[in-house]
């Protein structure tokens, strides 16, 4: 018989988890103003809030940390990292930063001016925040297929070429660059096809524009190209990554995802003028150019992590666990953004809690119910995260309202996936008893989901 799939690693160190009572969780979430970001980690049993910086490093990464060069200038660890990034992406100019949003801050400080228009595919929260905080506008050009969570198409993260062309045809002079998020987190961790990257490149060239990849999960995107797109089944993940980046002019990276580290990020580009411009903001915001807010040991671990994760065995293990959880939800009839993405399950809260109006934030309500049910912490990717329109100050209800359940890399077993699925089933089975949601009692102007205060209705 054919041998079943198994993880590409064995476990060397473990961390205990603490269970809690329903009564404790009801009190804790109330004290947190019904914002799961405000919970303490020891109040959480299985943490699916994010996959950013929450993964486990390998023994080789830990070994590399012992060799980290902590020199302020000219760190050997930086040059090791730079060599690895250039080998994978083809980008010669590299600036390290302490995380992905810092990379955006440094690069966008150089490129984004008031009144600018930045088209792309579902800009994530920090990306949109850095654009809108500069009095510029993020224009979503994602394909319409992404709006139908039950539609099975392989690349729902794609940029719609017609939408992109329309923006450029009408307002090209206001566009500093095009941004493509791989994978498309806000749309459900959905991948972008290689063909679509070529199309975006061709449109950019037509109008003389450059392309940036928001690359936090670029390896997951490469895996889906390997698995779903014709002509790539015989390619290595590194070969697919190299072709992907050949269609970009630069990238921002949160290394806390596909870099397999707990902290770090970087900017990389093929253009010296972008590098020279970003340098001016790296030094005052992040630090000197050969550390940029990162320790030498963290740069050393990141270099190893990037190399490890761009091997098929590593990334396949990661994706298969997310697919395992998706199969359990299929068994229970729970709707999520299909097909399942690379780093998380995105439960369609509008379908689960269809009796709760959008003004009462169904996805946040579902996240609260799941936490109370089993101590599983998820994250709303929906109407609260969307923030208010920067001009009208009205809530933006036009997109999807999803409960994201991120799976940390190399951390949980499939038994934990079974717990998550069973807890969701319990909530799903009593969904008709959940008739009211939450209201906002305090919020910030940008990226409100991190600190918003809510009340149950």
Located regions from the model:
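Conserved PLP-enzyme active-site core in the AAT-like
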Residues: 2-34, 38-55, 61, 70-94, ...
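Flexible glycine/proline-rich, aromatic-decorated loop/lid segments
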Residues: 137-140, 269, 274-277, 297, ...
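Short glycine/threonine-rich loop-to-helix capping motif typified by GTGT followed
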Residues: 192, 346-361, 390-396, 449-455
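Phosphate/diphosphate-binding loops
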Residues: 256-258, 362-369, 373-374
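Short, conserved charged micro-motifs
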Residues: 276, 354-362, 410-419
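Flexible, glycine/charged-enriched surface loops at secondary-structure junctions
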Residues: 289-296, 316-318, 333-340, 381, ...
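PLP-dependent enzyme catalytic core of the Aspartate aminotransferase-like
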Residues: 309, 373, 385-457
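Conserved glycine-rich beta-strand-loop-beta hairpin in the small C-terminal domain of fold type I
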Residues: 322-323, 337-349
């Amino acid at each position: 018989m054919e041998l079943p799939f198994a993880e590409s690693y064995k476990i060397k160190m473990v961390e205990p988890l603490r269970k809690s009572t329903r009564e404790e969780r009801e009190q804790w979430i109330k004290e947190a103003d019904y914002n799961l970001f405000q919970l303490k980690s020891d109040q959480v049993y299985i943490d699916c809030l994010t996959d950013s910086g929450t993964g486990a490093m390998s023994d080789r990464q830990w070994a590399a940390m012992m060799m980290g060069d902590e020199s302020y200038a000219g760190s050997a660890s930086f040059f090791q990292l730079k060599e690895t990034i250039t080998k994978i992406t083809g980008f010669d100019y590299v600036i390290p930063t302490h995380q992905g949003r810092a990379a955006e801050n440094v690069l966008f400080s150089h490129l984004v001016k008031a009144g600018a228009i930045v088209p792309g595919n579902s800009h994530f929260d920090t990306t949109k925040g850095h654009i809108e905080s500069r009095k510029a506008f993020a224009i979503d050009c994602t394909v319409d297929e992404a709006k139908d969570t039950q539609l099975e198409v392989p690349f729902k993260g794609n940029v719609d070429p017609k939408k992109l062309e329309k923006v450029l045809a009408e307002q090209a002079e206001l566009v500093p660059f095009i941004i493509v998020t791989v994978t498309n987190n806000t749309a459900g961790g959905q991948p972008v096809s290689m063909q679509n990257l070529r199309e975006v490149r061709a449109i950019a060239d037509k109008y003389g524009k450059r392309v940036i990849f928001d690359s936090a999960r670029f390896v997951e995107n490469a895996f889906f190209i390997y698995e779903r797109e014709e002509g790539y089944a015989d390619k290595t993940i590194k070969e697919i990554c190299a072709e992907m980046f050949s269609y970009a002019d630069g990238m921002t990276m949160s290394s806390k995802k596909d870099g397999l580290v707990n902290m770090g990020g970087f900017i990389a580009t093929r253009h010296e003028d972008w590098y020279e411009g970003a340098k001016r903001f790296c030094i005052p915001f992040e630090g000197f150019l050969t550390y940029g807010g990162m320790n030498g040991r963290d740069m050393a671990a990141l270099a190893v992590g990037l190399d490890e994760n761009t091997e098929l065995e590593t990334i396949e293990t990661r994706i298969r666990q997310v697919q395992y959880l998706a199969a359990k939800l299929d068994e229970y009839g729970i709707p999520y953004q299909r097909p399942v993405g690379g780093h998380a399950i995105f439960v369609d809260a509008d379908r689960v809690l269809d009796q709760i109006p959008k003004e009462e934030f169904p996805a946040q309500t579902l996240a609260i119910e799941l936490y109370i049910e089993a101590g599983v912490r998820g994250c709303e990717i929906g109407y609260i995260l969307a923030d208010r329109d920067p001009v009208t100050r009205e809530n933006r209800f036009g997109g999807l309202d999803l409960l994201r359940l991120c799976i940390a890399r190399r951390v949980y077993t499939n038994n934990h996936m079974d717990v998550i699925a069973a807890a969701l089933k319990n909530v799903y089975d009593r969904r008709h008893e959940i008739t009211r949601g939450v209201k906002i009692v305090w919020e910030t102007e940008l990226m409100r989901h991190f600190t918003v205060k809510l009340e149950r209705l």
